[in-house]
Amino acid sequence: MSRRVLLLEPNYKNKFPPIGLMKLATYFRLRGDDVVFYKGDLKEFVIHQITEECVAKLSYLDGSINWKLRSDKIALYIRYRKHEYLKQVGIEDSEIAPILEPWVEYYKKFYHSGEYKKYPRWDWVGVTTLFTFYWDITIETIEFAKLMVKDTKNIMVGGVMASIQPDEIEKATGIRPHIGTLHTPHKDIDKDNPYIIDELPLDYSILDEIDYVYPDSGAYYSYSTRGCIRKCS
C-alpha cells in the first residue's frame, strides 16, 4: 500500500534547492509512494489541502460541473469566510445546490475551528533544515509537521542545523533529528530499503510543485567532497 509522503522546507530564502529532500523524493517514488513537496506559507498549504477535499466532495456529488476550475474561489471562501466569495463559487449553478452548500460550509468550519488538526492525512513527513539563524521558522515548520503526520514516529528532521544542534531541536520539539547522511541500506527509513539514499539521483520535478524560485534551480548538482578534511579537536 502506497504512503502519502510530505516533504517540507521552511519558508526561508535560500539560493540552492533542498538536495536532501530531492533524494528522498526519488527514494519514496521508487517505493511507489505519493510524494508532495511544499515550501511556503503553512496556512496556505492547509487551505489548499482542505480545498482539494472540498472539490473532491463536490465533484462526487455533482460531476456535471468542473469544480476544479472554481477551486480558487472555494479557497478564498474557506480562508476569508466572506459571502461574496461563496457567491463567486457558483453553487447555485448546480441542480442540487441545497445539498452542496452545507458541504462548503463544513470545509470552511473544518479549517477555522482547527478540526483538521485531529485528522492528519500524511503517513510520513520529512523536514529539512539549514542555518541556525533560521531557528524560529525551522521549529515552526517541525511543529507544523507534527500536526500533519498520523504518527510522529514517522517524522524525519534532517539537514545542516539538525546535524549541528540535534539536542536543542529535540528539546524544543520532542522530535529527535537524524544526524548526518542517509547511507545505510536496510535501516534508513525502511528496514526493507535496498538503497543508499544519499547516492540516489535528485528528483528535480518536485521544484515544479512550488511557487518559490531558487536562483540556481536550473543547475545540476554533484558532490566532490563531504564535510571538512581537517581533523580539528
Labelled PLM ranges:
Residues G20, L24-Y27, F37-V46, K82-G218:
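Glycine-rich beta-alpha loop elements in corrinoid/cobalamin-binding modules
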Residues L8-N11, R31-I50:
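A short beta-strand-loop structural module common to alpha/beta enzyme folds
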Residues M1-L6:
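Extreme N-terminal starter segment of soluble prokaryotic enzymes
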Residues D62-K82, K87:
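Aromatic- and Gly/Pro-rich amphipathic surface segment
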Residues L7-P18, D203-S233:
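N-terminal pre-triad scaffold of radical SAM enzymes
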Residues L30, I74, I137:
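RNA-binding accessory domains that recognize and position tRNA/RNA substrates
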Residues N11-N14, N66, N154, N193:
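Detector for Asparagine
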Residues K43-N66:
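N-terminal beta-loop-helix "entrance" segment that forms/cooperates
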